[in-house]
């Protein structure tokens, strides 16, 4: 059978870049996609991440954490920062292959299974008050595994702003003091490289002005 050449292959680099930028702009305008991660996932910045024995593709996702300081419901993006207490380093560890059901269920993604294993949310080392962060959109996020850097990006490239994320969540639920919002991970997850966590690995994640976390990975006892 004849095969049609994909349209993007016929574009000049400038055209392709413009097309990709337009697609990303449209995606940024869409409603944020949100899931819940259980409090039982949270561990400290030096604690061990336990890799479940039945998970094949444990992955990392370094993110800027936003800690709520004042109750929020039905607020505007312009009001959102008034409800933020501070910022922290978070690593949204994920069982990558469990997100989408292997049985082909029409229900779709299984975020609980993929995200909420114990120890799957290294947090800290501290919560930095928002007043001490001059510009939350000028922070560098960097994550390495065994000394090799995989993520090295800026919050300037955040697709959905902190204000929009807080306001959107507050339009759906009541945000209470102490609630944590993980604002999304930049490029460089293990799945992008076909590299996944294994026992003995050490993740080191840092965000400008928020400190560094260093979490060794260990196998779950059977």
Where are these regions (language model features)?
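Active-site microenvironments in enzyme catalytic cores
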Residues: 1-146, 153, 160, 218
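Acidic, glycine-rich active-site loops and adjacent beta-strand->loop/helix elements
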Residues: 39-40, 94, 185-187, 209
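Residue-level signal for inorganic ion chemistry
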Residues: 123, 178, 207
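Short strand-turn-strand beta-turns centered on an Asx-Gly dipeptide
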Residues: 146-147, 208
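Charged, cofactor-coupling segments
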Residues: 156, 187-222
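A conserved acidic, glycine/proline-rich C-terminal tail/linker
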Residues: 161-197
């Amino acid at each position: 059978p004849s095969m049609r050449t994909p349209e993007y292959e016929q574009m000049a680099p400038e055209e392709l870049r413009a097309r990709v930028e337009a697609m990303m702009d449209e995606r940024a305008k869409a409603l944020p996609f949100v899931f819940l991660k259980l409090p039982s996932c949270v561990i400290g910045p030096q604690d061990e991440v336990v890799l479940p024995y039945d998970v094949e593709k444990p992955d990392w996702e370094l993110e800027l954490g936003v800690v709520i300081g004042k109750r929020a419901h039905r607020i505007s993006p312009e009001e959102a920062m008034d409800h933020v207490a501070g910022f922290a380093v978070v690593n949204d560890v994920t069982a990558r292959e469990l997100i989408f059901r292997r049985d082909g269920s029409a229900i779709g993604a299984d975020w609980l299974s993929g995200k909420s294993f114990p120890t799957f949310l290294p947090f800290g080392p501290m919560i930095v008050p928002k007043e001490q962060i001059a510009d939350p959109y000028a922070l560098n996020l960097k994550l390495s595994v065994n000394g090799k850097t995989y993520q090295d990006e800026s919050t300037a490239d955040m697709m959905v702003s902190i204000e929009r994320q807080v306001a959107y969540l507050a339009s759906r639920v009541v945000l209470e003091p102490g609630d944590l919002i993980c604002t999304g991970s930049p490029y460089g997850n293990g799945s992008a490289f076909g590299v996944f966590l294994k026992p003995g690995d050490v993740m080191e994640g840092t965000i400008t002005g928020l400190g560094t976390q260093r979490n060794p990975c260990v196998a779950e006892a059977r």
